Regions:
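All-alpha prenyltransferase/terpene-synthase fold signal
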Residues: 1-130
Length: 130
């Protein structure tokens, strides 16, 4: 799950760069972890179900290489169900994070989008078709 760990780290680093509190960093770790997990499950599903033309890379490589994936561990239906659970948990975590974000108190700070960019990334990661 190297890609998932990288995604989690990137989300947390964004918070660190913005001077996030420990509470916010914990929330960002959770969001990043779920985002990374969702991305990985979706990647495994796409590798098993999509064709190479749609993916833009060779489909079925994980199975051909004997890799352990969410699809090999849970089956297609199980991996889809797990992705649905992760996506719902991610949505809830993003909503809670956005609700806790006040608007910036001064004009020197960029406008606060209450995590909209992160939410958009989450949707792309777990609902993508390639």
């Amino acid at each position: 799950m190297k890609t998932g760990a990288l995604i989690e780290a990137a989300v947390v680093m964004g918070g660190l760069l913005r001077g996030a509190s420990e509470v916010d960093l914990a929330a960002l770790r959770r969001i990043g972890g779920l985002l990374g997990l969702g991305f990985q499950i979706k990647d495994d599903l796409l590798d098993a179900e999509a064709d190479s033309a749609t993916l833009g890379k060779t489909a079925g490589k994980d199975e051909a290489q004997g890799k352990s994936t969410y699809v090999t561990l849970l089956g297609l239906d199980g991996a889809r169900a797990r992705l649905d659970v992760v996506a719902a948990e991610l949505d809830a975590a993003l909503l809670a994070f956005a609700a806790a974000r006040p608007a910036p108190a001064n004009d020197a700070m960029p406008a606060n989008d209450n995590g909209q960019a992160l939410a958009d990334l989450a949707v792309m990661a777990v609902r993508r078709s390639r």
